[in-house]
Structure formats: structure tokens, C-alpha cells
């Protein structure tokens, strides 16, 4: 029997069959092909070696390289601190700064410690030595420079009574504090030459100055290297820099070393009572909430001051952190809150942010920081301060932002972020809003117009099922609807798995992120990539579609449009700029989607294609799907003649023929492959680079689609997303991965990592079905390994310790001596069992406090914080007999308390029921910080600059509430420098497991109380 050569009876198959079939057709009708030209043999070779074609090899390699090329630098920037210069920059001595840091952190120095007094005197001496060296440098200067006027204030007078806390209707906490701040004022070249602060009621003239602040007190359980030792030595170096020849400031510079920040920002509040607080209009606050690493720009008041940080050699930070404070997601505070909220200054908060496990512990020391970290903060401080003191405009000399505040003007909300730690972007929030609104309106219109044009040109293959031939009314399938709902299903399934993994980790091993955040990231990323690839390949196997990219980008654009709407609303109504990355994400997605729509112009019009298909039907739909399932309605050409002889590229079968054809083998689900199919499969792909340019079993009209535009699409979306999402994801992980010890639920951390993993990898979705199996298979192995590790590994180590919180409480009324540890259950009980003195005691644990934290107590070793005194004499107080006073509303009772403690300068008075008012003779009051509120005062904290001070406290309460005053007087001891003063703490440090870090629970390490 002769082989049929009638093209109407040819079923075009894969491999050589397709070539033979199409060659026969092209000989009869070259116009059959959408391009109008029959393919040439050489085109296959060129396409096969096209390095940017939309084929598995280039897609896998290019996508992987782009991700690696951007993620690796992001990781390096995030984990490696830029090296300090080998030689000292002009006006700075890094060796001197490092030596100062070593001396400062040689012991614990909280406000309520004798070491704190020693540090105070040492700082005064250091300032004096720096100024002496500066004067000598000016005398030796060949240019004949004149040393600036510098004034050093050892503020031993400022005190203040104020209140804090009291959310809603809850009673507030009253505070009396006596400051011990050190203030250095360097007179600017353009400053008023009069010492206006010496005159009662004197006021500064001219432009406002610049304040740089750091606090020199530490917590009682931390050496304070980064909190805030690096800030302190940076201030000392700023004094050195701005008093050196050639560096004199044009505007006055105030450098504040405040004492008492760790105890509710008391030092900054005391500064508000000093005359110089009226002079400064801008500020730079140097802080630390970690141990080493890079100093991040944590938050700023406005764009005008933020621009001066831009000149930092290694800027680092994002507006996301600032918005975290605005939305109440970050609960800790710094002196920034006082300078901005009370004084009305405009400025910046620069702080170390990781690792939080070392924050307020004995690992906040010089061994866990570096000279590089010192230089990172110092260089940023020099650049920012230099810009502020050199600025002579009137930007910061406007109307006061509030009552009692300085005339610093009102700033503009801004957006800011760094790029790879080397450049810094800053622009107005209104600009972000304008761009967002423009994109929201213009982008849909552009796509709508293009869609109309494509429809007019009869090239809108998207959303098309079939095309009707006008002459015969015959309907021909174009299969343009294929893949429409593929992407949302895949996205939901793949992302849902990550959410499930988040819940799994939070349930089985919630603290693994504490020490192994990168393992969690690896698990999330590898899981999403493999599952998305697997589902995409299944969909492409059964229903291949050349419109997969177009539909995927369209769905992504729709989702990003909704997110951009939400972000724009927050920008407009709440001044929240944290969604700035969505603007760039949306813009890149729009450009990629636009390219997919523009590609359709290269296709033949649908009517012509339908005529050609009707005249020369080439196949019954997809070979893959049709061999497994019956052809669907959109795959069969209506009315076509499909009963002719089918040519499959093999000889007519005879009695001696093989049961299977030479080129055909049965595979999955009896799907018959040709020899070339099998070869492709064995090489890791199932592609078919036929002469027509159609990939695999995709729609025949797709031969006219360009094969290189995917690179543009990926470059529009991929790098932008990686840079922004990668940076923010790492930043958030560093800030959040170790908050579980503080009582914060870790599920939100895992979900945040899952969400950022999805956002980071979404750019791969339109292309991932073209990946070869090598990368996904490797990532499957990574996923399995990291999943097992994350579920089974112990979450703490000597480098990433679990923080527990210590306090010892002694009740003089009952003689009860109780040591308490607060931490995460069950670890806190495991730790207590390792303590010898607790091994035979009855351990009592309170009910769960927050997110698994419990307070467990036992009778502990007696404290020795006061030498040669019996315990019952460690604190003393007396209360005068209440006296009444009639008011318009209700009778008020008065009483006077005298409170004192041995070897301490911190006590407090707790009341069983809130009192109405209180006062201390000689204390300053400030309307900007009211000392009482209508809901009353439940506690008064007392701080003195002198040891064993006697506080006199007058209190008032409503007679109808109580006839007599009831409560407790508590005195605090926070000095743990001397071994043996707090034996229970010494024992805990000696016997606790190496994966445990000890921090303070309350203001005092030891608290002794007596009732009244």
C-alpha cells in the first residue's frame, strides 16, 4: 500500500513526524504557516542554540543566575559589616574609641549602681582630655585656627515629676527622677555669642542648634556595649571631630550623654528641664537593641532631616521600621520619643537591631561587637551631624508643632530605604501617593486600550475559545482560554502549604526560628518553588498553553492592583509608607503584562488562522491530552474531515511488524511517545523544537510569538522584587526572629516569612513551567532536609541563647525570700531544675502570662546587697496621720510619706487603690508631661542622684475611696558587679545551661518590700 501524501489526512505528531508532515504541507501551501514562510532546516539549529529563547535551558539558567546574583549580595550586606578604615579619618581616632568602649563596658553600670557614678566621672575626664587636645591642636595649627567655645555642663540640678503608662482607664505610674546628665555645647560659628542660659528666663537667639544623644547607663544584666556604649563613644568622637581644626560647626552642636534611659527614658526627660533643651531644633539619637552588626536608621520625623543621613558612607534601614512604631507593632521606645513627642524636635533614630538574644544580657559586650560596628555608627553620625550643623536654611525654624515645644517647624512625611547598603533613596510621601494613584488609573486604561486594538485587529487570542469562519459559519478552536484559572489555583495551593508549614513549626518546634532563621527561609522557599513547578508542569502536560505567561501576569497585576489600592489608602489616611515596595512591584508587573499583550500583535488574525486550520487541519488538539483524555470541545475543529488516513511516520504494519511501532513507546497512562519524545524525556525536558517554532503541544498559532521577550518580562519584575522584598524580609527576620523569649507569639513570625517567601518568588511563576527538573529536584531535597531539621533540632545554642528574666523579692512582713525566673515553658522549669538551691525546693509557677511565658518561684539564697545591716533595716519609711480637706466634689485626704533605703537610690511606693495626686517638695513639674491624670496613680517610682536619700512624698486620695492609705514600700538593688552580693543570681549564672541568657525582669534585681 502506498503512503498517503494528502495533507488533509496528515496527523502532525512530535519529532520527525511533525517535520515531515509540515514539510509536505509547506510544499503544497506555503501560506499555511502564520508567518507566511515555510520553516527552514537551519532555523531549528539556530533556535536550539538561542541563549535567551523561552526554552527550559535558558529559562532555568537565567532565572537562577539573576536570583543568585541579587540574593547573595543582599545576604552579604545584611550579615557583614563594612570594614573600618585602616588609618584614622581626619578628626577621628578609632583606636581611642575602641579603648573607651572597653573601659565603659568593663562592668554593669545601671543608674542604680556605684559603677554608674564611676562612669559619670570618667566621662567628664574624657571630655576634658578631648577638649585639651583640641585646644593644643588649634595652637599648633599652621593656619592659625581658633578653638571654638565649648561649654561642659555636669547637670546635677535638673529633676522632674511626671507620669507614664496608664493605657485607657488604667491607673498611671508616677515618677520622680533626679538627673545626672553630661551636656557639651560647641558654639557654632554663626551662633549668638552671649551665654544666654546664665540669665534667668534667658532664651536663645538665631537658628536652632543640633542635638546628638546617647545614654551611658546600662541595664543591670548587660555590659551595654551596643546599648548604648557604641553610641557613647561615638558622641565622644563627635566632640573630638567638631572641635578639630577645619571641622568647626556653623550651627551650634549640643552633645548629650544622658543617664537613666533604661528606666523609662528618665535621662531624656531630665534634659527637657535644662535651658539648652530650648535651643536645639534637630537631633540624632544613637541607640542599640542588639549586639554588633550594622546600625540601622530606625525611624525619622520627616524627610527634611532624613536627607542628611543620605550622605552616610554605608546607609542602612527602611521606613518599614518607622511605620512599625506608628502602627504599634513595635512596643519598645527610645529617647527619640521624648525629643519628638515632648520637645518637638525633628530628627533621626539610629540603632543596632540584632541579635535580640544578646540584648540586655552579658553578651552585650565588646567580644560580641567589633570596631567595624563602631565605625558604621560613627561614620553615619559624622555624616548626618555634619550635614545638620552646616545647613543654614530656615527649614527647621518655623512654628512650634505643639504647645510648649520649640519652634522647629513642621516636616514632611517621607519614604526612605537603602539599596545594598551603599546608596539611599528618600522622597516625599506625597510623591509616592501621586505615583500610586497614577499607576492605579493609567495602567488598566492602557491595557484596556491595547485589548480593544487587538480585538479590532482580530488578534485577541486571550479569552478566546473558538473563531467562526464568516463564509461557512464553521467554528474552529483556537484554545485561547487554556490556562486562564491555572495560576490562582497553583498560587493558592503552593502558598497554602507555606501557611500550613508555619502552623506546623509553631506547634511542634516554635523556637527554631530563634537560632535557625535561614533554615526556615530555606524550607519555605524550596517548598514553594518545587510545588509551584510541579503543579505547573502537570498543568502544562495536560493542557499546554502559549498564553500561560500572559494569564499569569494578568492575575498578578490584578492582585497587585488591589494591594496598591490598600497601600494608597494607608498612605493617604494614615501616612503609612511601609507599602512603598508595592508601587515598584506593581510597576514591574504592569510592564511585564504589557509585553504579553504586545506580543499578540505578532500573531495572525484569528479569522485567517481559522480558515487555514479548516483547510489544513494538522492535529486533533494536544497529543498529550488527547492520548489520555478524549479531545475537548475547544480542541476539535468543528465540521472538519478527520476520517482520512492518518500518517504516523511508520511503514504499513504487516504480520512481521513489532507490536509497538519503531518510534513509539507506551509511557505514563498509556500515553504513546515517539522516539524523539523519549529522547527529550531522557535528557530532562519534554520540549519539541519543531520547524514551526511551536513549543511542545502548545497552540499552533503561537509559532509567531517572539521567544526572547520573556527575558524583558523577568528583568522588569525579578530584580525589583528581589531587591525590595529580599531586603525587607531579612530586616524583619532580624527584628522578629528572637522576640519569642519576650512573650511574643512566633506564629506571626513564621507567617511573615511565608508571605515574604511568596512575594519573593512570585516573579518565577510565569516561567517556572519551563524549568528543567534539576533545580526543583535539588530544592525538594533541601526542603526535606530543612523540614526534618526545623522539626527536630534543639532551638537554642550558646550563640543564640534563650533569654529568661530574673528577680529576687524579699517580703519583710513575712520574711519570705523568693527567687523568680520568668520564661517560656517548659524550658524555664528545665533551667530551674539545673540550679542546686532549687533542686530540693517546691517550685511554684504562675499560670501562663503571655504566649507560653510563666513565672516560676522558689525559696532562694539570701541576698547580701547591704553590708553589716540586718535585713529589716534595709528600707525604712513613715507615714503621717491623714488629714482631710474639703473640695467642691468630695472630701480629700492628705498624708506625707518619708521613704529611704540602704545602699540604694531607687525605691517605689505601690498603692492598693489609686490615689488622686502626689508631689515632692522642690520637684519641677512640666505641663508637657503631666504628673497625674483623672484615672489616678497606682505607683510612684523614686530615683535620686544621691545614695540613701530620704524622699518626701505628699499624696492625696478621695475619702470616699478609702479611709486609710494602704500599700507597700519597695526599695530596689541593681548592682551585680560584686560577686556574692546577689548569690542567687551568681548561682544561676554558674549552673544554668550554656544556651540560657539572664536578663532583668524589673527595675531591680533585688526588691525588698514592706506594707503599710
From Swiss-Prot:
Show which residues form the site (Transition state stabilizer): 359
Q: What is its main location?
A: membrane
What is the active site of this protein?
Answer: 261 (proton acceptor)
For bias type Polar residues, the affected ranges are 614-629
- Topological domain (Cytoplasmic) residues are 1-60, 454-487, 540-550, 597-710, 765-777
According to the record, how does the cofactor bind? Answer: Binds 2 Zn(2+) ions per subunit.
Annotated stretches, region: Disordered = 614-660
Q: What is its EC number?
A: 3.4.-.-
What cofactor does this chain's UniProt record say it requires?
Answer: Zn(2+)
Q: Which GO terms describe its biological process?
A: proteolysis
Could you name the domain of life of the organism this protein comes from?
Answer: Eukaryota
* Carbohydrate-modified residues: 159, 842, 878
**UniProtKB keywords:** Glycoprotein, Hydrolase, Membrane, Metal-binding, Metalloprotease, Protease, Transmembrane, Transmembrane helix, Vacuole, Zinc
Bilayer-crossing regions: 61-81, 433-453, 488-508, 519-539, 551-571, 576-596, 711-731, 744-764, 778-798
Q: Does the keyword Zinc apply?
A: yes
The EC category is: hydrolase
Residues engaged in binding Zn(2+) 2: 227, 262, 360
Q: Which Gene3D superfamilies match?
A: Zn peptidases (3.40.630.10)
| Location of this chain's protein in the cell | Vacuole membrane
What topology does it adopt in the membrane?
A: Multi-pass membrane protein
Q: Which residues bind Zn(2+) 1?
A: 215, 227, 287
Describe the family membership recorded for this protein in Swiss-Prot or TrEMBL. Belongs to the peptidase M28 family.
The UniProt entry, under PANTHER family, shows: METALLOPEPTIDASE M28 FAMILY MEMBER, VACUOLAR MEMBRANE PROTEASE
User: What does the protein in this record do?
Assistant: May be involved in vacuolar sorting and osmoregulation.
Query: What is the protein's name according to its record?
Result: Vacuolar membrane protease
